[in-house]
């Protein structure tokens, strides 16, 4: 459950999941996920498996191949769906379809999806992140064993470009 309040003098958000450790065993089923222990939990602790599987099936039907999906390390209810790597412009379009599918499928299951980057204090972050691989002649461009942090000059320029234009990118990327 996600809620928010916006008024002239206050902005707040709330997030709750029945299986979260802070709720105790509210539904009496004994399936509370301990703090920082949700990573790859199996059913019955993975209460979002059916919903997440349907999301992935719909993504596949829309031409977005999925590498895997699983519960994430943070609080109960956080999960990761990783699409296969693909051509950047195609994946940029796919990211919008992915968010659309996630929001609507969550609603179908009586849940609320959020991409808030840090919804719960003291827990692992949430939100949407991307994996990027830049190739030239079939070889990765970002890696350089002799470069600072094992990154190539191109990788540093790429990250610098993202940082320089991040305000504009955020305005366009939801």
Regions found by a protein language model. Give the residues of each.
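Glycine-rich, acidic/polar active-site loops that bind/position phosphate-bearing ligands
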Residues: 1-174
């Amino acid at each position: 459950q996600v809620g928010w309040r916006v008024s002239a003098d206050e902005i707040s958000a709330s997030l709750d999941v029945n299986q979260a450790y802070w709720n105790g065993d509210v539904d009496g089923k004994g399936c509370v996920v301990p703090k920082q222990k949700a990573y790859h939990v199996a059913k019955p602790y993975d209460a979002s498996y059916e919903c997440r599987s349907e999301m992935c099936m719909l993504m596949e039907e829309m031409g977005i191949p999925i590498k895997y999906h699983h519960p994430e390390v943070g609080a109960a209810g956080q999960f990761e769906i990783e699409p296969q790597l693909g051509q950047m412009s195609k994946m940029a379009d796919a990211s919008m379809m992915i968010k659309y599918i996630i929001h609507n499928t969550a609603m179908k299951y009586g849940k609320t999806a959020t991409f808030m980057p840090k919804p719960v204090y003291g827990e692992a972050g949430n939100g949407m992140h991307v994996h990027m691989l830049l190739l030239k002649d079939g070889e990765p461009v970002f890696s350089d064993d002799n470069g600072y942090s094992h990154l190539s000059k191109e990788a540093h320029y790429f990250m610098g470009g993202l940082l320089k234009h991040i305000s504009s990118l955020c305005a366009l990327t939801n």
